[in-house]
Amino acid sequence: EVALVRVAQEEAEDVTNAMWEEVVRLRDVLKYEFFFPRTTHFAADVANEVDIAYPGWESETFDAKEILPTLAKAKLFVAHRTIGPFLESYGIAADRLALRAPDEEIDREEFILECIGVAQQRWYQKELYSPESISRDLFSGAVQLASNRGLFEPGGPELAAKRQDFADEF
């Protein structure tokens, strides 16, 4: 669901290929939160899930403009409850990281507490979908992902651009 919405928003020309690219990107983003099967099994699992909601989808050609109306006809949406809090938390952490000077040392614990405070404020302002997004564990996962991508250690001006790209993902 999340991959398809993003593909629709980007108005991709090759919807199927763009969907798979987005699914792989989401898998990479959430790799510290979920245990995913090997790539071949993962692709088969995703294809089976899509087939439940939209039988025969692999044999059709889609236009990005058709995605949202097609999704609107689905009987059950689960992504917002399943991975929504993860993406909200990661988005907050990525935004906070992008605001930091690239040469600044960042204390991980203080950063996580800052993210929790911002998340609580956004919840009170009704800017978050779920209070589950206010989670030390989820912010720790976001820090781990940012660290894995080399975005948490001090660096030069190029680091600021990489951090902003990371924030833009969410």
Question: Can you say where each PLM-predicted feature lies in the sequence?
Answer:
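Membrane-interfacial terminal anchoring regions of lipid-handling membrane enzymes
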Residues: 1-170
